[in-house]
Swiss-Prot record:
Pfam families referenced in this protein's UniProt entry, alphabetically: Ribosomal_L31
Signal peptide limits: none
Organism encoding this protein: Neisseria meningitidis serogroup B (strain ATCC BAA-335 / MC58)
PROSITE patterns listed in its UniProt record: RIBOSOMAL_L31
Name used for this protein in its record: Large ribosomal subunit protein bL31B
Entry-linked InterPro entries: Ribosomal_bL28/bL31-like_sf, Ribosomal_bL31, Ribosomal_bL31_B, Ribosomal_bL31_sf
Quaternary state and interactors: Part of the 50S ribosomal subunit.
Family of the protein in this entry: Belongs to the bacterial ribosomal protein bL31 family. Type B subfamily.
Entry annotated with the keyword Ribonucleoprotein: yes
Length: 91
C-alpha cells in the first residue's frame, strides 16, 4: 500500500446494528463523534451506530414487518370527512 494516501482518521471502527445486536470491525474514515464501545476482544473502538444492516433488514432476513398500508391521502380524507360532517350538522 502506498504511504500517505489515506486520511489521518483512517482507523478500525466498530459498525454496530443495535436492532440485531451485531457488529463489524472495519477500517474506515466514518465520523463517530467521540462515541466508543468495548468489543468482544476487550478493546475499545470508535462506534458508528447503524439503524439497519444486512443483519436486521427484512430483505436479507426474510422477516417482514407489518406496516400500515393506509396512505397519507386517505388519512387526510378521513379527518376531512369528519370535519365536514360536523360542519353540515351545524347548518
Amino acid at each position: 500500500m502506498k504511504p500517505n494516501i489515506h486520511p489521518d482518521n483512517y482507523r478500525t471502527v466498530l459498525f454496530f446494528d443495535s436492532s440485531a445486536n451485531e457488529g463489524w470491525l472495519i477500517r474506515s474514515c466514518a465520523e463517530t463523534h467521540g462515541k466508543t464501545m468495548v468489543w468482544t476482544d476487550g478493546k475499545e473502538y470508535p462506534l458508528f451506530s447503524l439503524d439497519t444492516s444486512s443483519a436486521s433488514h427484512p430483505v436479507y432476513t426474510g422477516k417482514q414487518r407489518n406496516v400500515n398500508t393506509e396512505g397519507r391521502a386517505s388519512k387526510f380524507n378521513q379527518r376531512f370527512q369528519s370535519v365536514m360532517s360536523s360542519f353540515r350538522k351545524d347548518k
